[in-house]
Amino acid sequence: LMGIGGALTGCGPAFIDLIIEALGDAGVKYGVPRKQAYEMVSQMILGSAKLQLQTGEHPGVLKDNVCSPAGTTICGDALEHAGIRAGFIDAIDAVMNK
């Protein structure tokens, strides 16, 4: 059986690639060329990861820091309503139970 470290670091890249693909598809939907959309999303993920590593801040704090009251980013909480957090946890559960 794969340990949790292996599950997070071995399977995690595929999950992140799915995020890149999905956000890239959203960019394409709104007129961004696919290659450019993937680059934009990949750079955003890289920047977010670097910021978390450099500051040591809890990811929830970093998320809240970029959400203005009644702003556009907080509208993205639709991801929570769609169950993204539970989906990731369920995916790791499936890996751990394989």
Segments (PLM) and residue ranges:
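Conserved Rossmann-fold dehydrogenase catalytic segment
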Residues: L1-A14, P33-Q36, H58-P59
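N-terminal glycine-rich phosphate-binding loop for ADP-containing cofactors
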Residues: F15-V32, D77
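NAD(P)-dependent Rossmann-like dehydrogenase/reductase catalytic/cofactor-binding core
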Residues: V28, E39-K98
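N-terminal alpha-helical segment
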Residues: L1, I19-L23, M44, T72
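Alpha-helix N-cap/helix-start motif at coil-to-helix transitions, marked by capping-box chemistry
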Residues: G10-L18, Y38-S42, C67
